[in-house]
């Protein structure tokens, strides 16, 4: 398949040719003329877990900046690809810990659709057909990114030729959808998620998620009026005060405590 000059990127946590996933990846590579770029999460992935500190909320800059290269990898390679292929193995009813870390750390981009307009294919080894929850998580993630799930290839068939046919068909669909710029209609997963984050980023979460607010405004995400005057006035004050570095540092130091403050009465130990 000729991708027509489009950038194709495969992200995986397993490249061993001794595994089903490794063999599916090898087959996918042969489907594209000129080869495809690959990111091996075991070698190039993030080196630490998300700290939940929300330092990224102000300007999409992770607290790990300077400690690993994940932020640059995500921006320069993942976000600049036209076609993404995510490859993983079902592990304990989810994907591997490396994939979990990848998804968690990519939150430095906040709630915005960082993969907007991309064609995404999934190569999954393991009983995905028996794990509706995992499938829905992956589908929701892609819809929330305003990307298009071109298809899923698994090793569920016992006949290797059938698996090869799935992989070949997925490669063809990825290129065909990219050529036509096709993005499928959003289901409840994507539509409700978009509305939820639209409301929250406009209202209660406008501070501290200043970067999200700017991006939502630029993309036309705030597509209805709101009258949450208390939240709007509070956020206006905090946005103004946070323009001063000493106050911003003070707020960042209290961020974690403030996030759990509404739940303290439920978290008290005897």
Write out the residue ranges for each language-model feature.
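Short, glycine-/small-residue-rich phosphate/pyrophosphate-handling segment
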Residues: 1, 116-155, 163
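N-terminal beta1-alpha1-beta2 submodule of the flavodoxin-like/Rossmannoid cofactor-binding fold
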Residues: 1-111, 149, 165-171, 175, ...
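Short beta->alpha junction loops
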Residues: 41-44, 153-160
